[in-house]
């Protein structure tokens, strides 16, 4: 496989074929919590993409100099430093969104996607491939968040990115918002539906029966 094809596979593979949420079922907790609005879903997706990509890059660059006995500590230190930078930038330039995301930006430190890619991929792969892998997994994570956020905000509040799309009865319109979709459990069911749809069209992702 040529370098260009391999880079493309690393970048696009996690979006559908190896999606971190839909196939690997990682990072679900934040997906439940931040998808009631598209705005927060988008910002969370961008934050995780940035942290995953740059943590992969930095860890890959020093992978041959990290003692095996302390590799997890080194990985978490790099990831935590990047999360602090992202959190401070959000507080400085998008304070209201930062308040809405609350602790979930900080919890990127413990996100299974970030830690998993650092340990399983960046520690064994050159920097550029690791960087693209981080972006690809961030895009895969973001695709699920945006799909869930789209449904939850549109039918739960009648809006997208805070702009009214479905005119609500309370404002003299026709649409009665479904408040259930604004509750975290609804995201769990929507993610389940997305997994079902993906595995229906890609049966190779269905787990083999024991």
Swiss-Prot record:
DNA-binding keyword on record: no
Keywords annotated in UniProt: Cell inner membrane, Cell membrane, Ion transport, Membrane, NAD, Sodium, Sodium transport, Translocase, Transmembrane, Transmembrane helix, Transport, Ubiquinone
GO terms for cellular component: plasma membrane
Subcellular location: Cell inner membrane
Any Gene Ontology biological process: sodium ion transport
Enzyme class: translocase
GO MF annotations in UniProt: oxidoreductase activity, acting on NAD(P)H, quinone or similar compound as acceptor
Database matches in InterPro entries: NqrD, NqrDE/RnfAE
UniProt catalytic activity: a ubiquinone + n Na(+)(in) + NADH + H(+) = a ubiquinol + n Na(+)(out) + NAD(+)
EC number: 7.2.1.1
Positions of transmembrane segments: 14-34, 42-62, 72-92, 103-123, 131-151, 178-198
Chief place where the protein resides: membrane
Topology within the bilayer: Multi-pass membrane protein
Transit peptide in keyword set: no
Family the entry assigns: Belongs to the NqrDE/RnfAE family.
Stated role: NQR complex catalyzes the reduction of ubiquinone-1 to ubiquinol by two successive reactions, coupled with the transport of Na(+) ions from the cytoplasm to the periplasm. NqrA to NqrE are probably involved in the second step, the conversion of ubisemiquinone to ubiquinol.
Subunit (UniProt): Composed of six subunits; NqrA, NqrB, NqrC, NqrD, NqrE and NqrF.
Name listed for the protein in its UniProt record: Na(+)-translocating NADH-quinone reductase subunit D
Gene name tied to this protein: nqrD
